[in-house]
């Protein structure tokens, strides 16, 4: 379904629910296009607060604050999808008359719940997934063991990110422990994919149905957290194009307005399996900030504001390396001295273990992304803790 609403003029207010680094970088992109940004978040120390024109500090469950926020902005978007269900219902029924909500509440409700997401992909598309089961109690848990066999991964249906909310189970003892410790129920049991690599595609769709895809990229994770992205993925053109087509299919089926990250596995037989969907800017799209004329944040703001979408092209190959926790931040002086490193820091004051503090992009001439040894040499000081070393 196409939305024929007019484009927002400069000076309009973009409302962003969530105050993390994705909201921060979205706000900066909005300012470049002449928009003001109003952040709704629960903490005054969140990264996006520093760059916003207006800020509401309130609980995501505060209906009064949500209503005032909706009345003060021209469009609402989201920097994370794990927003309380009651909040989404209130926005749908009590706030949609005040402003646009992009992407739609339906998109968030579908993608914030693994069961709903997998059911949607199975029923609305022909896109392949790893075998999975819905687990509500011990009986369905036994059926999952029978269907999937060990090992498999047990996951919470909601609030899983950066490796949280899941356990790798190899036997009944580990399974029973995981079933008890993972909350809330219900859970998802999912087969372990013997994958050759992990990929993702950023796809953006406008209010009038125009679709743009950035290049397919390859991702490396370290303890469940994205460590590094290679753009473009060093794969055959056929596989890269297939991954983009999968992302397009999902965006169309969701009637998406805005940007979305689609994470996939490439298995060892050459088949692609969708892993997760994130209807927002995504960590694996940060390479676009320096390797493309229009990055993922520019494209998202353009889409939700009803502006024309340029083509999602890159002028350079790129490595994106996350700066995670106190170990990486201790290297910051050397990072800042390294020629060719383009740092992006998120303004977080405390570097806790596993916390994303920023990222570094490194560019190469188009078509000249190095191999593993060249990547290690390029990253230098940052190569001492990288997924390539696993």
Indicate residue ranges for each PLM-predicted region.
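Anion (oxyanion) recognition and catalysis
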Residues: 31, 92-95, 122, 146, ...
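Active-site "cap" helix and flanking loop/linker of ATP-utilizing ligase/carboxylase catalytic domains
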Residues: 241-262, 268, 278-326
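Peripheral (often C-terminal) accessory segments that flank ATP-dependent C-N-forming ligase machineries
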Residues: 1-3, 10, 302-390
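Short acidic-glycine loop/turn motifs at beta-strand connectors
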Residues: 205-210, 267-270, 364-366
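Active-site nucleotide/adenylate-binding loops and adjacent lid/helix of ATP-dependent enzymes
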Residues: 110-200, 204-223, 227-250
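Protein kinase-like catalytic core scaffold
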Residues: 212, 260, 272-276
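ATP-binding N-terminal substructure of ATP-dependent carboxylate-amine bond-forming enzymes
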Residues: 1-112, 116, 139
């Amino acid at each position: 379904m196409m939305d024929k609403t007019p484009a927002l003029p400069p000076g309009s207010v973009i409302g962003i629910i969530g105050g993390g680094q994705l909201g921060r970088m979205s706000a900066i992109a909005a300012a470049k296009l002449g928009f003001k940004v109003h952040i709704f978040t629960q903490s005054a120390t969140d990264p996006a607060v520093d760059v916003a024109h207006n800020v509401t500090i309130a609980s995501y469950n505060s209906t009064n604050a949500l209503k005032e926020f909706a009345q003060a902005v021209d469009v609402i978007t989201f920097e994370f999808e794990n927003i309380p269900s009651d909040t989404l219902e209130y926005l749908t029924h009590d706030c949609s008359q005040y402003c646009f909500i992009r992407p739609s509440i339906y998109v968030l409700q579908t993608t914030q719940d693994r069961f709903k997401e997998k059911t949607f992909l199975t029923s609305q598309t022909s896109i392949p997934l790893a075998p999975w089961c819905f687990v509500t109690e011990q009986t369905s848990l036994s059926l999952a063991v029978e269907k999937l066999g060990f090992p498999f991964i047990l996951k919470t249906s909601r609030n899983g990110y950066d490796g949280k909310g899941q356990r790798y189970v190899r036997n009944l003892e580990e399974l029973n422990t995981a079933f008890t410790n993972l909350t809330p129920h219900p859970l998802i049991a999912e087969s372990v994919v013997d994958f050759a690599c992990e990929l993702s595609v950023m796809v953006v769709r406008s209010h009038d149905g125009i679709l743009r895809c950035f290049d397919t990229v390859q991702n490396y994770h370290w303890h469940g957290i994205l460590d590094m992205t290679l753009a473009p993925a060093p794969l055959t053109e056929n596989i890269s194009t297939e991954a983009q087509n999968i992302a397009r299919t999902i965006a169309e089926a969701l009637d998406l307005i805005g940007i979305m990250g689609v994470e996939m596995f490439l298995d060892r037989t050459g088949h692609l399996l969708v892993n997760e969907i994130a209807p927002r800017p995504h960590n694996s799209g940060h390479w676009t900030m320096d390797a493309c004329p229009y990055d993922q944040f520019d494209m998202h703001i353009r889409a939700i504001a009803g502006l024309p979408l340029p083509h999602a092209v890159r002028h350079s190959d790129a490595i994106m390396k996350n700066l995670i926790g106190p170990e990486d931040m201790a290297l910051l002086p050397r990072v800042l001295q390294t020629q060719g490193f383009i740092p992006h820091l998120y303004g977080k004051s405390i570097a806790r273990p596993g916390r994303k503090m920023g990222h570094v992009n490194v560019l190469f001439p188009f078509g000249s992304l190095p191999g593993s040894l060249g990547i290690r040499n390029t990253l230098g000081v940052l190569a001492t803790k990288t997924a390539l070393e696993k």
